[in-house]
Amino acid sequence: MTQLAREFGAYVIGTGRAADRQTVLDFDAQEFVDLDNDALEDVGEVDLVFDVIGGDIGKRSAGLIRAGGTLVSIVGPSGARPAGGLAVDFVVESDRAQLSQIVQRVRDGRLRTNIGNIAILDDAVAALNSTERRNGKTIIRVRP
């Protein structure tokens, strides 16, 4: 999401744990807020929050949205509503043309992925239920 936002001209502030700092910056965020050590509220007002965490962080993030801004949550209804802004739940809809554009961005090197683990289909449950903290997404290989 960070890379797409930057491609369309957004100034991106990423958040996470200190261990995530370099990864977030490598994926094109211009600033990083360490949620364990920095005051999220020091960011100031923003136009858009893309919430992938929810809970207290989601609620605090909603408070940063300026009038007319938007909170987008992929973790379901957050219960947080930005004052003077809009809150929407992120819904994925199949769109062949958009998927083709995303694939082309990956092929062109304009959109990078962060793959942390590749597992075969027989090991999918164990790979997805792992309690081990991983960097990157888990890919399940359907065919050997």
What are the language-model segments listed below?
Residues 1-144:
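Terminal helix/beta-alpha structural elements that buttress the NAD(P)+-binding lobe
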